[in-house]
């Protein structure tokens, strides 16, 4: 399924039904009086989250969303039926923005809903205008028009851990080995063109891990795959910086990644993370230990290493600890020691 994380849609809520102007006509009733009913209200346009969705693909070509109009009032004081609401399902993590990118709602919870466009009120029938001075009222009102607006649906992935690294750093390989995800793996840059989510199981717990497409220098300026996917990192509780162990200067790679995230958003600069040296099976044991020690001393961050199947358990254990520290109500929250697993 193609991953679509932003679409623009036009919303049209239902119009209210017109009020009715009529008079009671019944045998032996000479002055029946007004009996026109009110019109029904127009339907609303509602967005609701669905746990089974992970893309906005359904709205790529379905750009006009229109709710049902209210029915007009009828004689005998019968109110018109209200129009049905249009309920649109979106993935968890969807933001609803105005055309000027002002946030209207952030749908982060399962079954969370938001009324994006309100239907118009039904018009009044002539029966509602009857009073002691106007016993044969003929006036009525038309229904109000429903709201019309254009909004932007912006999806930001909800994940516990985000995998950050340069192209070909081994993010997809790591995700495929520790979770149920099957990302494309190749020996050329940018084999991952869209975020991929997998679920890793450790100690009877599940951790949602997102593989973010490779970041290059200038990504915050829209170079490479640009800022399109950097937004998905914002919702991750913690990050893993994956650095290719065969790089000559692994600290410069760490600095590049850290700077790009910081330039995109200051919130990412303070997000908890640890470092994972990948492709360690291509290096000698002593060289691996030296590089881990070097980057640990330079950054003060926990540094682990992994190969094709090496050291997955310790990496996942560290990831699980980061996630647990960010759970609401955890008394240890904010007391993370970056040098402890």
Swiss-Prot record:
Where does the Obg domain start and stop, copy by copy?
A: 1-158
**Domain OBG-type G stretches:** 159-341
Q: What is the species of this protein?
A: Neorickettsia sennetsu (strain ATCC VR-367 / Miyayama) (Ehrlichia sennetsu)
- Where does it reside? Cytoplasm
Q: Which family does it belong to?
A: Belongs to the TRAFAC class OBG-HflX-like GTPase superfamily. OBG GTPase family.
Q: How does it assemble?
A: Monomer.
What is the official name of this protein in its record? GTPase Obg
UniProt keyword Magnesium present? yes
Task: Give the matching PROSITE patterns.
Answer: G_OBG, OBG
**UniProt main location, coarse:** cytoplasm
Q: Where does GTP bind?
A: 165-172, 190-194, 211-214, 278-281, 306-308
- What does the protein in this record do? An essential GTPase which binds GTP, GDP and possibly (p)ppGpp with moderate affinity, with high nucleotide exchange rates and a fairly low GTP hydrolysis rate. Plays a role in control of the cell cycle, stress response, ribosome biogenesis and in those bacteria that undergo differentiation, in morphogenesis control.
Give an example GO molecular function.
GTPase activity
Could you say which cofactors this protein requires?
Answer: Mg(2+)
In terms of HAMAP family, this protein maps to:
GTPase_Obg
Q: What is its EC number?
A: 3.6.5.-
The intrachain disulfides are: none
Show the SUPFAM superfamilies listed in the entry. Obg GTP-binding protein N-terminal domain, P-loop containing nucleoside triphosphate hydrolases
What GO CC annotations are associated with the protein? Answer: cytoplasm
If you read the UniProt record, what top EC class would you report for this enzyme, in one word? hydrolase
Q: Which InterPro entries match?
A: G_OBG, GTP-bd, GTP-bd_Obg/CgtA, GTP1_OBG_dom, GTP1_OBG_dom_sf, OBG_GTPase, P-loop_NTPase
Q: In its UniProt record, which GO terms are filed under biological process?
A: ribosome biogenesis
């Amino acid at each position: 399924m193609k991953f679509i994380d932003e679409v623009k849609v036009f919303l049209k809520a239902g119009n209210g039904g017109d009020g009715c102007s009529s008079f009671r006509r019944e045998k032996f009733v000479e002055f029946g009086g007004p009996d026109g009913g009110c019109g029904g209200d127009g339907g609303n346009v509602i967005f609701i989250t669905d746990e089974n969705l992970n893309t906005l693909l359904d709205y790529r070509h379905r750009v006009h969303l229109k709710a049902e109009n209210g029915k007009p009032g009828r004689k005998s004081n019968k109110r018109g039926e209200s129009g049905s609401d249009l309920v649109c399902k979106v993935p968890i993590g969807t933001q609803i923005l105005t055309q000027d990118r002002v946030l209207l709602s952030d749908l982060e919870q399962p079954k969370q809903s938001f009324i994006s466009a309100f239907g118009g009120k039904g018009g009044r029938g002539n029966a509602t205008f009857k009073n002691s001075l106007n016993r044969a009222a003929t006036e009525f009102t038309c229904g109000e028009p429903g709201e019309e607006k254009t909004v932007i649906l912006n999806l930001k992935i909800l994940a516990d851990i985000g995998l950050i690294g340069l192209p070909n750093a081994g993010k997809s390989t790591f995700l495929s080995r520790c979770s149920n995800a099957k990302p494309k793996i190749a020996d050329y840059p940018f084999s991952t063109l869209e975020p991929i989510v997998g679920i890793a199981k450790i100690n009877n717990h599940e951790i949602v891990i997102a593989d973010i497409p490779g970041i290059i220098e200038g990504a915050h300026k829209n170079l490479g795959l640009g800022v399109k996917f950097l937004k998905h990192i914002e919702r991750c509780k913690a990050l893993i910086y994956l650095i290719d162990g065969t790089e000559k200067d692994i600290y410069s790679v760490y600095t590049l990644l850290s700077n790009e995230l910081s330039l995109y958003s200051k919130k990412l600069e303070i997000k908890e993370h640890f470092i994972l040296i990948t492709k360690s099976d291509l290096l000698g044991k002593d060289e691996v230990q030296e590089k881990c020690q070097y980057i640990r001393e330079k950054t003060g961050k926990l540094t682990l290493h992994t190969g094709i199947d090496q050291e997955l358990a310790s990496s996942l254990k560290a990831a699980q600890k980061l996630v647990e520290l960010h759970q609401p109500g955890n008394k240890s929250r904010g007391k993370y020691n970056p040098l402890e697993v």
